[in-house]
């Protein structure tokens, strides 16, 4: 196959892999494959017509590959991972607000947390309709089915009858219009890169002045819509007929589209069709939290803890983690280097995954789970992501300031959270600032 050919492309014939070889595909196993790989053994033998071995006439023993030794400190590695997760949770809690929506970019409304459980597949939507579903799950599912059908009917009316301009649509249905374009694009029907970005129609659309109906008909006339991938009854259509084919296709796609379903849940939560209490009970219904061992369960069910207080406490305890929510921030990395030797003592990417489930025999359910995870745990941020240095940069600035005499060990500054002397103005994650700090504390 193609993968085997790729592995063997630069190898001599006697060193090439065959389909039975085990190959490192991720992490260290992949990076050091040429070191870890051993040499296959072989046997030549005589067998009878039943396959029974009669005599081994030649044998070559296999040879193990080389060992590799890491400089990583296992305990430090675990400590850094846990510390990073805890720090991310503190930032989430600092920005978490008991509101439905917020205009402040850094705020995280509690409704975003409820939606995140669906959006990042923590709550299994399909399980809501299982034979053993709880009453709460069934109630949520029935509400969802009704709301989804209402939404599909409304979209059909907007696209086929009213042709409502975007400025006359609610934010919810503007979002659905954008999602329709995304779906058409990802399915190879709409080529957004081929649209004339200087055209009046395009600019009117992005500025909410016209309807999606008018914009798609323009795209059809410009040849940036391709319906050859859609099964149709004819090879020849005019513009109106192509538009109707697209609309029918989209509405049919949305009947069984998990991303569309997640959007429906998002707006059900925002409108109050599904309450925060129902979402929290779903966490217990589906085994994400355990009502038997959970010390907060009784306080929640008795009303001592509000929905917001319950979620806040669970995030603080890391029973609900940043990785589960996939809200900003939900990821990070730590690299610890020994300054005396330059050896790497810890290299952590959060969130991570269990690569033992992806070696030799791949666990398909687990692989599907992590590839669909919004936090992209298979992306190693410690080695692959370029990010601002953050607080690490403070040591460099402090050393430079001391060396140049701009500050001394007794200098203090007042941190207001945002550095407004330049535009754009960089801001700390804690927008209110850290107050007055000395050199050691900063």
What do the predicted segments below correspond to?
Residues 108-109, 369-371, 426-429:
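Short alpha-helix boundary/capping motifs
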Residues 337-372, 376-381, 386, 403-405, ...:
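Glycine- and small hydrophobic-enriched segments that form the cores of compact globular domains
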Residues 1-365:
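Periplasmic/cell-envelope proteins involved in peptidoglycan metabolism and beta-lactam response
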Residues 21, 61, 69, 376, ...:
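Preference for short coil/turn "hinge" residues that link or interrupt alpha-helices
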Residues 358-361, 387-439:
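Short, glycine/proline-biased beta-turn/loop segments that scaffold the active-site neighborhood
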Residues 66-72, 326-332, 365-393, 410-413, ...:
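Short active-site loop at a secondary-structure junction
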């Amino acid at each position: 196959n193609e993968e085997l050919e790729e592995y063997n492309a630069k190898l001599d014939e006697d060193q090439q892999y065959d389909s039975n070889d085990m190959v490192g595909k991720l992490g260290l196993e992949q990076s050091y494959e040429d070191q870890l790989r051993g040499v296959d053994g072989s046997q030549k033998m005589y067998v009878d017509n039943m396959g029974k071995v009669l005599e081994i006439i030649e044998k070559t023993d296999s040879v193990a590959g080389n060992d590799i030794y890491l400089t990583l400190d296992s305990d430090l590695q675990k400590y850094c991972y846990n510390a990073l997760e805890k720090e991310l949770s503190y930032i989430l809690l600092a920005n978490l607000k008991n509101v439905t929506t917020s205009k402040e970019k850094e705020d995280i409304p509690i409704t975003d947390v409820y939606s995140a459980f669906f959006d990042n597949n923590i709550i299994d939507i399909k399980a809501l309709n299982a034979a053993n579903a709880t009453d709460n799950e069934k109630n949520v599912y029935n509400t969802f089915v009704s709301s989804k059908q209402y939404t599909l009917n409304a979209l059909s009316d907007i696209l086929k009858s009213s042709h409502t301009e975007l400025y006359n649509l609610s934010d919810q249905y503007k979002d659905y219009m954008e999602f329709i374009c995304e779906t058409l694009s990802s399915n190879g029907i709409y080529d957004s890169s081929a649209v004339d970005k200087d055209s009046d129609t395009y600019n009117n659309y992005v500025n909410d002045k016209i309807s999606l109906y008018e914009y798609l008909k323009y795209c059809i006339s410009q040849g940036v819509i391709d319906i050859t991938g859609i099964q149709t009854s004819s090879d020849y259509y005019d513009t109106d007929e192509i538009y109707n084919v697209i609309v029918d296709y989209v509405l049919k796609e949305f009947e069984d589209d998990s991303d569309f379903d997640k959007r429906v849940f998002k707006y059900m939560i925002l409108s109050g069709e599904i309450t925060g209490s129902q979402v929290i009970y779903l966490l217990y219904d589906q085994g994400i939290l355990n009502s038997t061992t959970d010390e907060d369960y009784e306080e929640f069910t008795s009303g001592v803890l509000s929905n917001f207080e319950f979620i806040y406490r669970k995030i603080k305890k890391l029973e609900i983690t940043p990785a589960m929510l996939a809200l900003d921030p939900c990821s990070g990395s730590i690299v610890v280097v020994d300054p005396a030797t330059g050896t790497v003592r810890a290299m952590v990417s959060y969130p991570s995954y269990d690569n033992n489930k992806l070696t030799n025999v791949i666990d398909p359910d687990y692989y599907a789970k992590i590839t669909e995870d919004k936090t992209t745990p298979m992306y190693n941020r410690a080695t692959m992501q370029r990010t601002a240095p953050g607080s690490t940069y403070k040591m460099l600035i402090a050393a430079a300031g001391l060396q140049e005499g701009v500050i001394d060990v007794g200098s203090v500054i007042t941190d207001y959270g945002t550095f407004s002397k330049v535009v754009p103005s960089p801001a700390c994650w804690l927008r209110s600032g850290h107050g007055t700090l000395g050199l050691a504390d900063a």
